[in-house]
């Protein structure tokens, strides 16, 4: 019982106890992803970024060989964090760049939520070294990360889990941060993320808002609804 009471990995994620790092969400890296649909990957990554912004999670964005190979980070991700410094690297392992280590230390949170490309390379090596050398706890966002094959992604996730990484998904992380729907200061922004990024769940929320609670539809443009006009039937 004593060990369980002192096991910090049993704690839920909160806005106060964690930080976030996005690793190499760049076009050339995304081109190689075969473990999941790449548009879904991008959707999930941007949704996670928006959630981190809502809850004021200290966030790091790092990139590799932007000009010579990988290309610019998803614009939709960067737009969530205007003015954010981007930590450029040459190393595959983010831990091998001193700027990244310094940023992690400055944020002062031992729980690190990680999303990146590719799972079997940059995510795996960073996680192993950050746990071993930095004593960080790693929460790997499986559906905002991708590998060159499904097997590569799955095996990398298994290796990391065996080493002590905690696997999570983007919506799981966001809802752990929210925790209680009575927290009204973040309720509406969280539901906006759900409506835009959570697929069928989001469509269901849209339906409930507009058809049950009679809230206005969320599109920004105006549209007329023209009444039915039956055509002649012969």
Report the location of each language-model feature.
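Active-site acidic carboxylates
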Residues: 2-91, 106, 137, 154-158, ...
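Glycine-rich phosphate-binding loop at the start of an alpha helix
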Residues: 46, 98, 120-124
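Short, ordered loop/turn segments at secondary-structure junctions
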Residues: 64-65, 91, 143-146, 172-173
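Acidic, metal-coordinating catalytic cores used for nucleic-acid/nucleotide bond scission
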Residues: 66-70, 92-94, 119-123, 149
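Distinct, well-ordered alpha-helical segments
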Residues: 70-77, 101, 126-131
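Short phosphate-binding loop-to-helix
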Residues: 89-102
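Glycine-rich phosphate-binding loop signature in dinucleotide/nucleotide-binding domains
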Residues: 104-110
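A contiguous pocket-lining binding segment that forms or flanks enzyme active sites
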Residues: 110-170
């Amino acid at each position: 019982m004593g060990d369980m009471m002192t096991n910090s990995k049993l704690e839920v994620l909160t806005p106060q106890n964690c930080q976030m790092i996005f690793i190499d969400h760049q076009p050339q890296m995304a081109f190689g992803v075969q473990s999941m649909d790449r548009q879904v990957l991008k959707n999930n990554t941007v949704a996670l970024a928006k959630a981190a912004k809502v809850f004021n999670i200290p966030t790091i964005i790092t990139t590799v060989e932007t000009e010579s190979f990988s290309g610019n980070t998803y614009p939709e991700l960067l737009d969530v964090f205007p003015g954010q410094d981007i930590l450029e690297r040459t190393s595959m392992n983010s831990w091998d760049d001193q700027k990244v280590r310094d940023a992690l230390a400055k944020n002062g949170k031992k729980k690190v939520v990680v999303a990146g490309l590719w799972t079997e390379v940059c995510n795996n090596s960073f996680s192993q070294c950050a746990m071993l050398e930095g004593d960080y706890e790693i929460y790997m966002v499986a559906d905002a990360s991708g590998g060159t094959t499904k097997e590569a992604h799955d095996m990398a996730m298994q290796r990391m889990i065996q080493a002590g990484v905690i696997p999570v998904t983007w919506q799981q992380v966001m809802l752990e941060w929210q925790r209680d729907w009575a927290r009204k200061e973040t309720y509406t922004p969280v539901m906006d993320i759900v409506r835009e990024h959570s697929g069928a769940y989001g469509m269901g929320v849209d339906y409930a808002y507009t058809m049950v609670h009679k809230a206005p539809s969320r599109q920004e443009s105006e549209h007329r609804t023209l009444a039915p006009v039956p055509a002649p039937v012969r």
